[in-house]
Amino acid sequence: EPENDDLQNRRINREQTPGEVYRNVYPMYVSKTIYEGLRQDDPDRRAMIFTRSGFSGMQRYAAATWSGDVGHDWETLRRQIVGGLGQMATGLPWWTYDAGGFFRPGDQYTNTGYHEQLIRWIQAGTFFPLMRVHGYMSNTEPWRYGEKVEHIIARYLDLRYRLLPYIYSQNAAVSFNGSTLMRPLVMDFPEDRFALEQNYQFMFGPSILVAPVVESGVNRMKVYLPECAAGWVDFWDG
């Protein structure tokens, strides 16, 4: 991990180069080295690298990253979505977070307030480039949180699998055309000034607009729909 191997005040490349020169770009070179090694050893197999650190350009080396060891509260959830969309806007398409937060409450299996948060994290993460659940020193299987939570999570896991043909097709576009799977609304609707104001809504490919719930106690919410020539169809009921 980078915080345990700081290049500051060190010299590399046979003592010829100050470590600061490569400090930020170093993670990309690590991904490049691993990618090229994987391709050399097994050229018929696609490479996939999941790395804690990254840098601009690492997408060319099949490298994905995530937002790191984060908490679980509502503000943290909101920040993850904004941060992820920011990464998409820089051209780095492979990103996710630890759904439910990496650091979780000690009573996570019985804490109904946390259960609401966990569900919302997973619902949003269903529409990320990668979907991932992880927690610090935790067993995170859905059934540990009770039947109600398990049922809801299972529904979204099933949805993720149903979306795989769409996800696979759009990921091909990411690779071949340099696009992104998840992106801010303004990237699809650049002439819509209100699209730029939507911090938490985003597009999942060209056909799905996602509006995750990012606060407690929400049963109804307003969703902004940019003007679209083809119109919009409710995903859940048509």
Where are these regions (language model features)?
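Catalytic-domain carbohydrate-binding cleft regions of carbohydrate-active enzymes
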Residues: 1-238
